Amino acid sequence: MAQNSTQLEKISGSFTRLAEAFQLALTACREIEESLPSILGEKSEVSKPFKPAVTDPSNAKKEINMAIESPSKKATSPKKATPAAVAPVEATSAVDTSEAVASMTPNKRKARDPAQPKRPPSAYNLFQKNQRSEIKESLGEKSNDVKEVNKAMHEKWGSLSEDDRKTYEEEASKLREAYEEEMAAYNASKENASVADSRVTAEETSTKPSEDLSSPTKKDLIDFSETRPLAQASRATPDIKEQHAKKPKRKHTRSTVPTSNVEPVSQPQPSPDKIVSSPNPPSAKREKKKRRKSSMSSSITTPPTAKVAN
C-alpha cells in the first residue's frame, strides 16, 4: 500500500507540472497574438516595394512622340540666309536639280525612248474612264476613298451585260491593232538605224590602217647609228653552237711502239692462305641428288619381303 501511494503522489506531481507548463504556453501564445499587429505593421512599412505613379497610355505615347520629334525639328530647322548667299544659289538651282535627277534615275529604271508608242488601254480601263465620275457621285462621302471606288467599279463591271461590254472591247481591239502597226514601224526604223551604225563603224575601222601606214610616227623612226653597233657585235660574236660544230673531232691513234720489247705486267696473285676450297662443289651436290632419287625409286618398286616361318 505504501508503494502504491508513493506512485500516485509521483503521478499527481507530474500532472501538476504539465498543467503549469500548459498554462505558461497559453500565456505566451496570447502575448504573441497581442504583439503580432504591431510587429507586422512595422515590417510592412519597410518592406513595401516602390510603385511608380500610373499614367494614361495615351499621354505616355504623346510624351514619347514629342521627345522623338523635338531633336529632329531642331536639327532640320532652317537658318536665315543672307541675301548675298541666296543670289548664287538661285542661279544654280535649276542646274543642280537636273543633275540630281539624272544621277538618280539611271540606277532605278532605264530611260524610255520617246519615239516608242505607248501601250493601249484595255476594255476595263476604258470603262473606268467613262464611269468613274458617276460612281464617285453615287458614293457621296466615300467618294474620296480609293478602295471603295474601285470596289464599286468592279461590281458594276461584273453586272454589265455582253452588249454593253462589246462597245468597250471593240474600242480596245481597234487601239490594240493601231499599237501593233506603230510598234512594227518603230522596230523597223530601229533595225535600220543599227545597220547604218554598224556600216559607219566598219568604214572607220577599214580606214584606220591606211592612215597609220601613210603617216608614221616619231617612235617608228630609229637612227642608223643606234642599230649599227648591235649589228657589228652580232657579227663579231658567233653563236656557241657554230663554235662547237667547227671544232674537229679527235682521232684515236694506235701507238707505233713494238710490243716485243715491252715486258708484260704481272698481276698480283692471291696468297694460298686466303684461298678457301669450297666444301661442296656443284658436281658433288648433283651426285647426292641422284643417289636420293635412286633410293626413293627402289623403295617404291621393291615391296617388303615377308618372313617365312620355319
Curated annotation (Swiss-Prot):
Region (Disordered): 69-310
Bias kind Basic and acidic residues: ranges: 131-178, 200-226
Residue ranges for the DNA-binding region feature of this UniProt entry: 117-187
Keyword terms of this UniProt record: Cytoplasm, DNA-binding, Phosphoprotein
Residues the record lists as Phosphoserine modifications: S70, S161, S214, S215, S271, S278, S294, S295, S297
Ranges annotated as biased composition (Polar residues): 255-268
Short name of any one Pfam family annotated for the protein: HMG_box_2
GO biological process: transcription by RNA polymerase I; transcription initiation at RNA polymerase I promoter
Gene3D superfamilies hit by this protein: High mobility group box domain
GO MF annotation list: DNA binding; RNA polymerase I general transcription initiation factor activity
Record PTM Phosphothreonine, positions in chain: T105, T217, T237, T302, T305
Broad class of the protein's primary localization: cytoplasm
Composition skew (Low complexity), residue ranges: 69-95
Subcellular location: Cytoplasm
InterPro entries reported for this sequence: HMG_box_dom, HMG_box_dom_sf, HMGB
One GO CC term on file: nucleolus
PANTHER family named in the record: HIGH MOBILITY GROUP PROTEIN DSP1, MITOCHONDRIAL TRANSCRIPTION FACTOR A, ISOFORM B
Protein name: HMG box-containing protein C28F2.11
Native organism: Schizosaccharomyces pombe (strain 972 / ATCC 24843) (Fission yeast)
